[in-house]
């Protein structure tokens, strides 16, 4: 169960009705493929299960960056309490120290390498892949390597020439919207996690919005998109295991909504915080600083832990005995409530996402929820939510700088 409650004044439906129609039209057009991913993942899961069923491996190394890795890390962190088939490590940066640390600590013959790049030409990913090949010097990469990429990409052509397994990403699904495609499903199957439940959760979110006509998400998008002063959106997650989801949200929100149309610039800056620890750093800025922030809280109702504060009374610290005997998970959720109400009392726009427990189904719901929210705000801004021209400029400059260094 995932429930979203809004603590600000809602708009009249007449104000948001046109945006609902445009979001429906976009989803039905077939041009933006992520909308349909909840309905088309079963074949990928079946194919992945067939591939991994006879494989013997202790480690999985995922090589990818941005949308090819950040969502997988969110899954790994959120579900780390579950027993997994292997240990997953992620190489998502040109960091030689981390590369050495990982490659020197695993046994090649008991490792599956997943090379993940939608375009197939991501310089960081391919550079790390080359370094892996140079380090291990495998005679047959089809035994240990699989590839996730666009159909027809240069990386797919390389994989096919090497007789290696390839999983494709639909052409009309952008990288940061691809977590419900092979990008997320294949690593989940490799880890022994319930990938079907992830899709079921996302399908439930889709049904709630498009079939049940729940306007909560649209109201939230409209309020945040049209807020006069608040151009910073804080996701305050009260669970350590949601730190990865925060990172995924930051990429999705920033890369999708930070756009320029002519001389007009758009964007809502995303910030991910983890409660309660970030109450002791960032909360002061939200409470007493510039009123340029809205806050979305997430709390997990059942954290699957009965750990309590011991009934101990320490000399000179007995003023803190009021927490004795209370579950830590209950305390952290009460901290969420207290912080939220403190912000409401200050007139700050907040909303609360309550999750019954952290499992594959609810995680799938959250992924689809934030993707829909991003699309809705993009429509309200009138920007192209699905491109990233600012990033492409940097890539071209990088190539010219590297070539210049080689002269």
Task: Locate the predicted segments by residue.
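Active-site phosphate/pyrophosphate-binding segments
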Residues: 48-49, 141-296, 390-407
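A generic structural motif
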Residues: 117-122, 173, 187-193, 240-241, ...
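Flexible loop/turn segments at secondary-structure boundaries
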Residues: 68-70, 97-98, 121-123, 153-156, ...
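Extended, charge-enriched "interface" segments that sit outside catalytic cores
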Residues: 1-53, 312-326
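C-terminal catalytic subdomain
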Residues: 241-354, 361, 375-377, 381, ...
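Glycine-rich phosphate-binding loops that contact phosphosugars or nucleotide phosphates
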Residues: 57-210, 396-400
